Regions:
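Active-site-adjacent scaffolding segments
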Residues: 108, 112-126, 139-144
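Short, acidic/small-residue loops that bind anionic groups at enzyme active sites
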Residues: 134-148, 291-299
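Structural beta-alpha unit
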Residues: 1-2, 16, 75-113, 233-266, ...
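General small-molecule cofactor/ligand-binding pocket signal
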Residues: 37-39, 88-92, 144, 192-194, ...
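A short acidic, glycine-rich active-site loop
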Residues: 57-71, 213-227
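Glycine-rich, Arg-bearing micro-motifs that act as flexible, cationic patches
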Residues: 115-134, 265-291
Length: 311
């Protein structure tokens, strides 16, 4: 897994809130040697069109506005630069920041995108707006969502699904494991791997043979998942206590596990929906992302979003 180029997305209206994201990029760059770009995407409606200025004057005003934002980014970059990290700054202009960003990612090397998020106060949840969900679904590169407050590079968990029916998910599981291993190397994080499964509930079993031996069916289901999970995690020299096969619905099991184990980072995959370039997160995954109290690293299958600039 290559980590040479990191982009940190900075809200031009709240640039100081990007400090945790910049810190995370600095941690990774310090050990990987990656170059970091601080990127803002600015827009002011009054500079988009005006009867008072011609197009040339408007363009100059936008350039001036973006130059001020770049100066702010340079100031934010100063601590990292003093650490010897290569940091550049850029400001792009556009009404829809997600589309502008995805176009930029299509022409700029990027191995990891980092974005700060906000939480809804005492209930400790991420606060995702509509544009955030667009980015989560459409971003073609690994996306690290950073939370406010102190963060310790202690434990990570990769949520894998070795029996997923979606084509290409096996490669995504391997990608999750590669990233987990790399973060262990770079940040000395303790790796954990988790697979949650749930047999078909008894109330939904209509086959007479299965109804008669539901307990046997449940045991066979557990064995099938255990064998597939053990085969997958055998690719990594991880102690058995750091592998977790849990029975239950993922949206219930995963947030509870993260809280009980004091997990600092969740690695989770998002699969593509047929030929579309958006990610099929689904109700389950969206509930997980909305409930977990840790930072998130969301990965897509290789080849995802070849034309991700389109909705």
């Amino acid at each position: 897994m290559s980590l040479r180029h990191i982009i940190v997305l900075v809200d031009p209206n709240h640039s100081q809130q990007a400090t945790p994201a910049i810190n995370r990029a600095s941690q990774l760059a310090a050990t990987s040697g990656a170059a970091v770009q601080l990127l803002s995407i600015a827009y002011r409606s009054e500079l988009d069109s005006s009867h008072l200025f011609d197009l040339t004057d408007l363009e100059k005003l936008r350039e001036s506005f973006c130059s001020k934002k770049v100066a702010e980014l340079n100031e934010l970059a100063s601590p990292a630069i003093k650490q010897g990290i290569h940091v550049s700054s850029a400001c792009l202009w556009g009404r829809d920041w997600v589309d502008v960003l995805l176009t930029h990612l299509g022409s700029t090397p990027c191995d990891l995108l980092i974005k700060a998020t906000h939480k809804t106060g005492a209930i400790k949840r991420f606060l995702f707006g509509g544009s955030d969900w667009q980015l989560i679904r459409r971003c073609p590169v690994p996306l690290w969502l950073v939370r406010e407050g102190d963060w310790h590079a202690g434990k990570l968990v990769a949520a894998v699904d070795p029996l997923h029916s979606q084509e290409g998910y096996a490669g995504l599981d391997r990608k999750l494991m590669h990233w987990a291993a790399r973060l262990h190397e770079l940040l000395n994080m303790e790796e954990h791997y988790l697979h949650a499964f749930m047999p078909l509930p008894r109330t939904l079993v209509f086959d007479a043979e299965l109804v008669a031996d539901y307990d046997g069916y449940a045991r066979r289901c557990q064995l099938q998942h255990r064998e597939a999970f053990e085969k997958l995690v055998s690719q990594r020299p991880v102690p058995l206590p750091q592998t977790h096969l849990l029975q239950g619905y993922t949206e219930d099991v995963l947030p509870a596990f993260i809280e009980q184990q004091s997990i600092d980072l969740l690695l989770i995959g998002a699969v593509s929906r047929g030929q579309l370039d958006t990610a099929l997160l689904g109700h389950t995954a969206e509930r997980v992302l909305d409930q977990v109290d840790c930072e998130l690293l969301i990965l897509k299958p290789d080849g995802f979003g070849q034309d991700s600039s389109k909705p």
